[in-house]
């Protein structure tokens, strides 16, 4: 079977999958990748198999799209370019996802909570943090609960 025939008959599978996963931002890129994969799958499909071509394509394309999502999640680095730069000749700044989340968290916290979180992330125990901050252990526990509550409220 020629690929044009396969494409004309089964192109709706690609649109369905992209709609199923609410892909709107990089629609064309995902469409192109799925189209290439559809061509590859049409080359290896055996009509003598028990599975129809449409179910074969749907299953394989669905799993391929999921694999693409997983690959994208493994790319944790984000490039942030300066807004005031008219050209992209400047060196971009790299932040990983954890740094960006920490920045968001730090914006929510007051000074004491930020200091507690910084010390906690550096590996200090609660009693050590209490000594460094010159606060009681019960106050440190209250700060910890406050940070936890703010994070859960804003990020869950």
Swiss-Prot record:
Q: Which GO terms describe its biological process?
A: DNA-templated transcription initiation
Motif Polymerase core binding per UniProt: ranges: 29-44
Query: What is known about its induction?
Result: Autoregulated.
Q: From the UniProt record, which GO molecular function terms apply?
A: DNA binding; sigma factor activity
Q: Which SUPFAM superfamilies match?
A: C-terminal effector domain of the bipartite response regulators (SSF46894), Sigma2 domain of RNA polymerase sigma factors (SSF88946)
Description of the deletion phenotype: Cells lacking this gene display a decrease in viability during heat shock, long term survival and starvation experiments. They also exhibit significantly reduced virulence in a murine model of septic arthritis infection and decreased capacity to colonize host tissues.
Say yes or no: keyword DNA-binding present.
Answer: yes
- What Gene3D superfamilies does this protein's entry cite? Winged helix-like DNA-binding domain superfamily/Winged helix DNA-binding domain
Q: Mind listing the UniProt keywords for this protein, alphabetically?
A: DNA-binding, Sigma factor, Transcription, Transcription regulation
DNA-binding interval(s)? 126-145
Q: Say what the protein does.
A: Sigma factors are initiation factors that promote the attachment of RNA polymerase to specific initiation sites and are then released. Sigma-S contributes to the protection against external stress, thus playing a role in cellular fitness and survival.
Family indicated by similarity: Belongs to the sigma-70 factor family.
The name on file for this protein is: RNA polymerase sigma factor SigS
Gene encoding it? sigS
């Amino acid at each position: 079977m020629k690929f044009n025939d396969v494409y004309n008959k089964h192109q709706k599978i690609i649109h369905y999958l992209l709609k199923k996963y609410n892909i709107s931002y990089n629609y064309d890129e995902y469409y192109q990748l799925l189209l290439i994969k559809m061509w590859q799958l049409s080359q290896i499909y055996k009509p003598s198999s028990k599975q129809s071509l449409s179910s074969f394509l749907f299953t394989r394309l669905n799993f391929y799209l999921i694999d693409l999502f997983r690959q994208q999640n493994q790319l944790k680095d984000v490039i942030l370019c300066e807004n005031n730069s008219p050209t992209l000749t400047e060196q971009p700044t790299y932040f990983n996802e954890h740094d960006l989340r920490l920045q968001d968290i730090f914006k929510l916290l007051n000074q004491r909570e930020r200091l507690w979180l910084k010390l906690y992330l550096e590996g200090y125990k609660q009693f050590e943090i209490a000594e460094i901050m010159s606060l009681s252990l019960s106050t440190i526990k209250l700060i910890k609960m406050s940070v936890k509550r703010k994070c859960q409220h804003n990020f869950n």
